[in-house]
Amino acid sequence: MKHARQAKILEIIDKEVIETQEEIADRLKKAGMEVTQATISRDIKELRLIKVMTEDGRYKYAPFNSTDNTVFNRLMTVFSKSYVSSDYANNIVVVKTLPGMAPAAASAIDSMNYPEIVGSIAGDDTVLIVCRSEKIAKEFVEKLSKLAKSDDK
């Protein structure tokens, strides 16, 4: 069921300009699949869907292609330019960003698809990242610091 639903979501966003999760739910319902907003949200994350600008200036869902270096490089640039500092406590990493930039930084971190990351939550200027262990958290802080320094601010 999950794979069929996710395949249908990919088919829908390939054929139509879909701007909201509600539109995805509506199209799935028309295809005979009842889903909740939470399920759609999880599917979007698992499918690595991102919002891209259309020619008319609207934003639509599209698959994130990890081989698309342009998008990946943009996300890494956003991260490095928004990064202020990072630290860890036990298996939790806290990333400080410029005001208003935490959601973009979290998106960049999520797009890295590190298996050692359980999940992340973004506020206004802080990203909370849950790692699988304290050792991994320490290593991840070092990775983030190197990544932020790799691009001249």
UniProtKB/Swiss-Prot annotation:
Family label: Belongs to the ArgR family.
Keyword Transcription regulation: yes
Keywords: Amino-acid biosynthesis, Arginine biosynthesis, Cytoplasm, DNA-binding, Repressor, Transcription, Transcription regulation
Compartment(s) of residence: Cytoplasm
Protein name: Arginine repressor
GO annotation, biological process: L-arginine biosynthetic process; protein complex oligomerization; regulation of arginine biosynthetic process
PANTHER family (UniProt xref): ARGININE REPRESSOR
Domain of life from the UniProt record: Bacteria
Pathway: Amino-acid biosynthesis; L-arginine biosynthesis [regulation]
